[in-house]
Amino acid sequence: MKIYDYNGKKNICGDRIHEARCKHRLTQSDLAAKLQIAGITIERDSVSRIEIGTRFVADYELRELSKILNVSVGWLLGIE
């Protein structure tokens, strides 16, 4: 499978995830723990890689991130 980049990044939501996480005063470890409670297997370093754009984000991860961060998926994708 070929891996594609968009403007040098593997996702378009990392900046928004970082913004929302900081607004809620969560650490990357806190966010990873909340995702794990929701059934998503993810570690702190993966959250970091998502935020800097070096890791893809699956649709089910995006859905849970939007719930945890109390924002819409559209906002995370930059279309709202």
Language model feature labels by segment:
Residues 1-24:
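A short, Lys/Arg-rich alpha-helix, primarily the initiator
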Residues 8, 37-38, 53:
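Short helix-capping/hinge SLiMs at alpha-helix to coil transitions
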Residues 12-15, 25-26, 42, 57-60:
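Residue-level signal for the short linker/turn that defines the boundary of a DNA-recognition helix
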Residues 25-49:
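Short alpha-helical DNA-recognition segment
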Residues 35, 46, 51, 61, ...:
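DNA major-groove recognition helix of helix-turn-helix
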Residues 54, 58-75:
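DNA major-groove recognition helix of helix-turn-helix/homeodomain DNA-binding modules
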